[in-house]
Amino acid sequence: MPSEILLKIFSYLDAVSLLCAGCVSRRFYHLANDNFIWIRIYSTAFSPTRSNWKVNSVEKIAVSVSFLSVQDKEAGYWKKEYITKQIASVKAALADILKPVNPYTGLPVKTKEALRMFGLGWAIILKEKSGKEYIMEHVDLSVNDTSVTVIWYGKNWPCLASLSTLDLCGVTPVFMDWYKTPTKHRLRWHSLIAKYNLSHLTVSTMIGCDRLIRIFCLHPGLLVGVWKKEEELAFVMANLHFHHLVERSTLGSATIPYELPPHSPFLDDSPEYGLHGYQLHVDLHSGGVFYLCGTFRNLFTKKGNIENGHVKLIVIHLKNNREHLPLIGKVGLSWKTDILDGCIKSCSMMDVTLLDEHGKPFWCFSSPVCMRSPATPADGPSFLGQTYSVDYVDAEGRVHVELVWIRETEEYLIVNLVLYLSIAKINRWFGTEY
């Protein structure tokens, strides 16, 4: 068919159909880049009248000049301009929906709505040592109170021994309504969230196992399940905290993560500024089942509790029985693949949201954790039952939990919960010099 006829046909297509047509063949690709077609699509989608603007003479002249200069632009110029504008409009809409903040959690009120409305998803990119890549979109996810758990599984995993790294990316449709009708060739952009080294699947990172699989925890917040018998991948599970999740999943590039905006300290002349007024919300959960959901307000500490670059913030005191909390149900981390499922005892996901005295998120994370034995409470009361501990550590702080298994009631009891906050982070956040 003559190119003139094809161009005439293409001129009746919308942007999505035109992009799909460009994937058919090399000839169609070049024809679908026609600037005259794309400037019409661009002008219709982003015209001043469409945005309820008042069109003045300067704008009219600018539009006319744009049409006259079409031939001066390289092929595909107006297609790129249109896609760039679409991406910018999606980002602007995301920023707008995330403005309202929940005073209880310090997090955006409409995070769940944003995930749904904008078709946000996640993908992992498995890279072989040879350079070959495998892109896998998430199979399942569950939205929790302050995090989302994303799962990948299937039958076509590449050989684990050949893999070097795993990239976790947010995936967003360029056109906001595309996610409603999924297609293999839909136009999307990737935002790198984290990069993991798969050579770190060692004994030191293994946190649990059952008769079928072993699970490994890679920082930040990634859980990798490996079949015991075959020593191959069974599943990958990422637990992502809501704090800046949408921004991290949409505003980065395929190779560079989104960089958080610089924090401006709230200055205060209080002698112990930055050591009081904290609020902690902590969840322990797995598979939609919550073992703990607790909020602790008005937490404080003293300068005398600063040691080894951290300040000790006691949330649950070991010697105060009234503060001790039970975990609800049988603690275990649920997993599944396309053919099997199971539950690994004593493991779960931990979500921590620590707000400063102004109600701003100071330290947030979501990560797999496990209870380890033995861990005898120091200088504490004599408990009847096995003792356990849960520990998490990163560059900004450490969480230490001590638990006791009560045989009579068959439940775990939290008898001590302590946060160790980085003094360097406190000084940066509050402008102090501890």
UniProtKB/Swiss-Prot annotation:
Superkingdom of origin: Eukaryota
GO cellular component terms, A-Z: SCF ubiquitin ligase complex
GTP-binding among keywords: no
SMART domains: FBOX
Pfam families for this protein: F-box-like
Keyword ATP-binding appears in the UniProt entry: no
Residue span(s) of domain F-box: 1-41
Record-linked InterPro entries: F-box-like_dom_sf, F-box_dom
Entry keyword set: Ubl conjugation pathway
Annotated S-S bridges: none
Subunit structure, interactors included: Directly interacts with SKP1 and CUL1.
Role played: Substrate-recognition component of the SCF (SKP1-CUL1-F-box protein)-type E3 ubiquitin ligase complex.
Record protein name field: F-box only protein 15
